[in-house]
Amino acid sequence: MKLLIVAVGQRVPDWAQTAYDDYAKRFPPELKVELKAVKTEPRGSKTLETLYAAERERIEAAIPRGTRVVVLDERGTGLTTKALAQRLKDWQLGGDDVALVIGGPDGLDPAFRQAAHERIRLSDLTLPHAMVRVLLIEQLYRAWSVNAGHPYHRE
């Protein structure tokens, strides 16, 4: 199974990339993690709908057919660590690859958000996108460690 993290926005601070890379290399070979950064649409005088459409096109191009789409959304379902671990286990048993989508500064196209298989929320707080990448990969690693009985997660 592969976890594909699709993030709108290419540039993150060095500390965030270092942290992301550290967690990404910890995953076992049977659970591959890949990051695809897609270009943020330049604002200029474009309407929000135009921005959404351009970013949606790039996001959809980054996600292979047959992949389960999970969007990160402030209105999504909040999960505990144990609940995310169960979700990860369910995804693995389902056999499909999973794309977790992080929207751009303006969020995600509402129709794309609605069409996703799932909508989850990492926090009730508004977080910078670099922090979301790090938080998401850490929580996915933690969920894996819960399922694997690895000592990383402690109760």
From Swiss-Prot:
InterPro entries: Alpha/beta_knot_MTases, RlmH-like, tRNA_m1G_MTases_N. Its main location: cytoplasm. GO terms for molecular function: rRNA (pseudouridine-N3-)-methyltransferase activity. The keyword Transferase applies. SUPFAM superfamilies: alpha/beta knot (SSF75217). Keywords: Cytoplasm, Methyltransferase, rRNA processing, S-adenosyl-L-methionine, Transferase. Gene3D superfamilies: 3.40.1280.10. Its EC number is 2.1.1.177. Pfam families: SPOUT_MTase. The keyword Methyltransferase applies. It is found in: Cytoplasm. It catalyses: pseudouridine(1915) in 23S rRNA + S-adenosyl-L-methionine = N(3)-methylpseudouridine(1915) in 23S rRNA + S-adenosyl-L-homocysteine + H(+). GO terms for cellular component: cytoplasm. It comes from the Bacteria. S-adenosyl-L-methionine binds at L72, G103, L122, S123, D124, L125, T126, L127. Specifically methylates the pseudouridine at position 1915 (m3Psi1915) in 23S rRNA. Belongs to the RNA methyltransferase RlmH family. Homodimer. This is Ribosomal RNA large subunit methyltransferase H. It comes from Acidovorax sp. (strain JS42).
